[in-house]
Amino acid sequence: MSSLIEYPLVTEKAMDEMDFDNKLQFIVDTDATKDEIENEIESRYEITIIDTKTQITPRAKKKATVRLSDDDDAQDIASRIGVF
């Protein structure tokens, strides 16, 4: 089975959400459901997700925005996965 997560999204808006709202953004497989996305991210990065929002971008990519629990720091996770 291939990975549902294609890559972390690194934009100015994504960085603001990471800094101020404890959220991370990923480009994911267009057929992935919210539950599948949550399970994949939680198991891969060993974090707890509070909420997941998805949208299809104008370039036909699926963007997932996940809000992390207060116990997890989005900046630490981003550093671990190579965003910085």
Swiss-Prot record:
It holds the Pfam family Ribosomal_L23. One of its GO terms (cellular component) is ribosome. The keyword Ribosomal protein applies. One of its GO terms (molecular function) is rRNA binding. GO terms for biological process: translation. InterPro entries: Nucleotide-bd_a/b_plait_sf, Ribosomal_uL23, Ribosomal_uL23-like, Ribosomal_uL23/eL15/eS24_sf, Ribosomal_uL23_CS. Keywords: Ribonucleoprotein, Ribosomal protein, RNA-binding, rRNA-binding. The keyword tRNA processing does not apply. Part of the 50S ribosomal subunit. Contacts protein L29. Binds to 23S rRNA. One of the proteins that surrounds the polypeptide exit tunnel on the outside of the ribosome. Belongs to the universal ribosomal protein uL23 family. This is Large ribosomal subunit protein uL23. It comes from Haloquadratum walsbyi (strain DSM 16790 / HBSQ001).
